[in-house]
Swiss-Prot record:
Stimulates the secretion of gonadotropins; it stimulates the secretion of both luteinizing and follicle-stimulating hormones. Belongs to the GnRH family. It comes from Homo sapiens (Human). The keyword Transmembrane does not apply. InterPro entries: GnRH (IPR002012), Gonadoliberin (IPR019792). This is Progonadoliberin-2. GO terms for molecular function: gonadotropin hormone-releasing hormone activity; gonadotropin-releasing hormone receptor binding; hormone activity.
Length: 120
C-alpha cells in the first residue's frame, strides 16, 4: 500500500509542472509587454521586415538576408551561458527530481516512534 502511494506521488510530481510557463498567451500578441498595436499588420513576421526583404521574393533570398545580418549573428553559439539564462523548464525538472529523491529516501528511513501521550 505504501509503495503504491509513493508511486502515485512520484507520478504526480513528475507530471505536474510547478514552474512558470515559457509560452506566451495568444492574446498578448507579438510585442513585449502586452497586446498587439492597433496599427500592426495581420502577419507580424512580414510587418517587421523592411520592403523587399520578404522571403518569397527574389530580393529577399536567404543569401541576401544573411548578408543583411550583423557579422556575429551567424557565429556558433558558445555554451557560456550563466545558470540564470537557462530555461526554467530544465531547472523545474531538476527541482522535481531532487524532491522525488528526497521523498523516496525519506520514505525508506525508519520513522522515530511518536512521543507517548501518557505523561503523568
Amino acid at each position: 500500500m505504501a509503495s503504491s502511494r509513493r508511486g502515485l506521488l512520484l507520478l504526480l510530481l513528475l507530471t505536474a509542472h510547478l514552474g512558470p510557463s515559457e509560452a506566451q498567451h495568444w492574446s498578448h500578441g507579438w510585442y513585449p509587454g502586452g497586446k498587439r498595436a492597433l496599427s500592426s499588420a495581420q502577419d507580424p513576421q512580414n510587418a517587421l521586415r523592411p520592403p523587399g526583404r520578404a522571403l518569397d521574393t527574389a530580393a529577399g533570398s536567404p543569401v541576401q538576408t544573411a548578408h543583411g545580418l550583423p557579422s556575429d549573428a551567424l557565429a556558433p553559439l558558445d555554451d557560456s551561458m550563466p545558470w540564470e539564462g537557462r530555461t526554467t523548464a530544465q531547472w523545474s525538472l531538476h527541482r522535481k527530481r531532487h524532491l522525488a529523491r528526497t521523498l523516496l529516501t525519506a520514505a525508506r528511513e525508519p520513522r522515530p516512534a511518536p512521543p507517548s501521550s501518557n505523561k503523568v
